[in-house]
């Protein structure tokens, strides 16, 4: 499939932007899939996954000069993402975000490691289309006890994807973050089950509240109060 951009709409892609909105495309194809993206002048700018009828029409997978995208690219990118976070796991922390969507060149895919469980979100048409090779790569590279789908149904709706029935996916697992044990509600809780990105903030707050009485208002898992 080929997609040609409207005149003057190629600059963001040339500078590495991961998204192309429908208004930047000269003619919108009817089917979803991998597409070669061209400038209005016919220059190949890269490859992306096209989603018809979505405002965010193309999520870029490669840019100018990069090798073509293939299913094997998925495992290689997941492996690189895992390697980048290797130093974030230690004796006090067994949980971390392993894959962060466009930041790891895997659009719409979010994977959190919660102890020996993986919480995965397939929030784009690209991630859904490659669900099987993504799952196989995660099994091969990490060998988790289980992979639980915690996809964001609002995000999936924007992509024209069916909702995930989370009522059958409610699980809980014990994790360690900052040396503290937490019970993460996977599937029934917020987002992927735990706010892993607040680990450093919890440590900062604990540093200046030590020995003090603390009110943790509107808390989710009580992470900040437990850290104090």
What do these predicted ranges mean?
Residues 202-228:
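Conserved SAM/SAH cofactor-binding pocket of Class I
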Residues 1-113, 170:
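Non-catalytic accessory regions of SAM-dependent methyltransferases
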Residues 115-128:
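A short interface-forming secondary-structure element
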Residues 99-112, 128-195, 203:
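Non-catalytic substrate-recognition/targeting regions of SAM-dependent transferases
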Residues 70-77, 126, 130-134:
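Short amphipathic alpha-helical segments
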Residues 116, 182, 201, 218:
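Conserved hydrophobic/aromatic pocket- or pore-lining residues that grip, position, or stack substrates
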Residues 20, 37, 46, 118-121, ...:
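Short hydrophobic-aromatic micro-motifs
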């Amino acid at each position: 499939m080929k997609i040609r951009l409207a005149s003057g709409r190629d600059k963001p892609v040339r500078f590495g932007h991961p998204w192309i909105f429908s208004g930047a495309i000269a003619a919108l194809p009817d089917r979803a899939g991998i597409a070669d993206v061209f400038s209005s002048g016919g220059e190949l700018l890269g490859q992306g996954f096209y989603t018809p009828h979505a405002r965010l029409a193309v999520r870029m997978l490669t840019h100018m000069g990069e090798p073509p995208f293939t299913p094997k690219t998925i495992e290689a990118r997941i492996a690189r993402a895992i390697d980048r976070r290797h130093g974030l796991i230690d004796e006090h922390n067994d949980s971390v975000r392993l894959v962060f969507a466009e930041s790891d060149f895997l659009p719409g895919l979010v994977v959190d490691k919660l102890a020996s469980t993986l919480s995965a979100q397939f929030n784009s048409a690209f991630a859904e289309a490659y669900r099987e090779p993504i799952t196989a790569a995660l099994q091969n590279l990490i060998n988790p006890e289980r992979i639980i789908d915690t996809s964001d149904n609002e995000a999936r709706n924007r992509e024209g994807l069916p909702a995930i029935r989370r009522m059958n996916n409610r699980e809980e697992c014990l994790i360690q973050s900052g040396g503290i044990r937490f019970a993460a509600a996977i599937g029934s809780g917020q987002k992927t089950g735990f706010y892993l990105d607040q680990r450093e903030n919890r440590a900062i707050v604990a540093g200046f509240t030590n020995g003090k009485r603390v009110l943790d208002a509107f808390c989710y898992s009580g992470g900040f109060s437990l850290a104090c």
